[in-house]
Amino acid sequence: EYYTNNLGNTLTLVDVMRNHGCKDIIFSSSATVYGDPDSLPLTEESPKKPATNPYGWTKWMIEQILTDLHTADPEWNVVLLRYFNPIGAHPSGLMGEDPKGIPNNLLPYVAQVAIGKRECVHVFGDDYNTPDGRDYIHVCDLATGHAAALNWMNGRTGVEIFNLGTGKGTSVLEIIKAFSRACGKDLPYQIDPRRPGDVDANYADCSKAKREMGWEAKYTIDDMCRDSWNWQCKNPNGYEG
């Protein structure tokens, strides 16, 4: 399904764009292309590594497809935005993440524990070599990152890569504590075995985005948890509720 949705639809989109003379594209890529990093923080020059899942492979491949597209036709203007871990919701509470079934992503799961739909948060492993965790970024910061990229790319051609993150790693336990502050109660959690493929830490160097586009993340982990909790309270059963 990832291959059909991501690869197939991207090829269709590029073909339509080419037929209509539109050669400017911003691609929502992912930090998954870096794999298990050799060193931190991750810069845009950090090596790409083989993906560990189909989602990561599609991002890896689409980056290559768009790079090849520019090589074949230098008039193309391609910006690859490598997201780290988008979380949060719009501060109004009108827009948020509404997973179907059991959430695969951390923050919606934590929010459902806080609202009483799940028993506890599962923390996979407490034996990491570093307390640092993943780089979480507020969805509103991603939106301003896209706006900054649109302004930056105007009149240019080429292929450019930008990391979008906060530059700080946050552990799952730190997320749980921050969400507990947001909802006003201690959230239950249990330590489970570490999952294969989980990395010790993964966070960005976003200095290039600040230097080139004038962009940097504004929201903190507490802001992300507050806005996610606000959305969950206004939509306890999701949009269909």
Residue ranges of model-derived segments:
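Active-site loop of short-chain dehydrogenase/reductase
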Residues: 21-25, 75-77, 119-120, 156-160
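Catalytic helix-loop patch of NAD(P)-dependent Rossmann-fold dehydrogenases
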Residues: 4-12, 19, 23-24, 33-85, ...
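Residue(s) in the substrate-gating loop at a strand-loop-helix junction
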Residues: 30
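Mobile, glycine-enriched helix-loop/loop "lid" segments at the mouths of ligand-binding/catalytic clefts
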Residues: 93-121
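Glycine-rich "substrate-gating" loop/helix at the edge of Rossmann-like oxidoreductase active sites
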Residues: 52, 87-103, 126-140, 168
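Conserved mid-core alpha-helix of short-chain dehydrogenase/reductase
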Residues: 11-16, 141-144
